[in-house]
């Protein structure tokens, strides 16, 4: 007889979204000029812990069998590390390099948005992040100040949406039911509202149980 052990954990997603919110607000304030250019290294140091926090969320999400959340949070972690290192060290050509990086991230985000719609919290954060990555990327390549300020304003919007998502998911995990609307649908809705049989469906085909990835 083969036994498969499942261990309940607290949802790591509130931590992930709160981290996105705080880091987005910090970088947005720098882009808007609320924080001056000489303070960019201090901003980079404030953003650097976001890498560790979101990397932790990614690991926990993999353990919770949520490949979409794990992939997104892991990639977000890498993006904060790249930003912090480039801005903190004042590397030559940093804005232009980060511009290309953000446009590449935009392509990744668009692909992920196509598969995350049932998970509305992730989807909404992605949807508001896409124009910010576009504006940040173009600002880095062109040096246009209005694009930088637009990206900064969008960063504050991302912070608001991510804060709502984090708070709603934290309340849900604490009370064991949806308190604030998140808008799950399809498999994501059934995973929360369904019984144990829904959670165990096709378990033998999941990574870590099947023979190969």
Residue ranges and their predicted role:
Residues 1-55, 186-213:
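N-terminal topogenic module of multi-pass integral membrane proteins
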Residues 24-31, 55-58, 78-90, 108-113, ...:
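Hydrophobic alpha-helical transmembrane segments and adjacent interfacial helices
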Residues 60-70, 113-125:
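Membrane-helix interface "capping/anchor" motifs
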Residues 88-95, 114-121, 142-146:
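Membrane-interface helix caps and helix-loop-helix hairpins in membrane proteins
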């Amino acid at each position: 007889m083969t036994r498969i052990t499942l261990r309940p954990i607290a949802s790591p997603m509130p931590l992930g979204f709160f981290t996105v919110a705080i880091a987005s607000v910090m970088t947005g304030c720098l882009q808007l000029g609320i924080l001056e250019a000489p303070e960019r290294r201090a901003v980079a140091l404030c953003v650097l812990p976001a890498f560790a926090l979101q990397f932790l969320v990614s690991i926990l999400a993999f353990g919770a069998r949520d490949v979409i959340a794990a992939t997104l949070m892991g990639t977000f972690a890498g993006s904060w590390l790249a930003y912090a290192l480039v801005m903190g060290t004042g590397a030559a050509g940093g804005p232009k390099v980060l511009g290309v990086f953000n446009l590449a991230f935009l392509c990744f985000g668009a692909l992920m948005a196509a598969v995350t719609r049932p998970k509305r919290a992730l989807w909404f954060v992605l949807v508001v992040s896409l124009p910010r990555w576009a504006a940040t990327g173009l600002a880095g390549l062109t040096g246009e100040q209005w694009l930088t300020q637009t990206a900064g304003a969008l960063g504050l919007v991302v912070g608001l949406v991510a804060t709502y998502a984090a708070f709603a998911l934290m309340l849900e995990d604490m009370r064991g039911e949806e308190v604030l609307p998140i808008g799950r649908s399809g498999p994501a809705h059934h995973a929360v509202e369904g019984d144990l049989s829904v959670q165990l469906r096709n378990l033998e085909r999941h990574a870590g149980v099947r023979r190969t990835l």
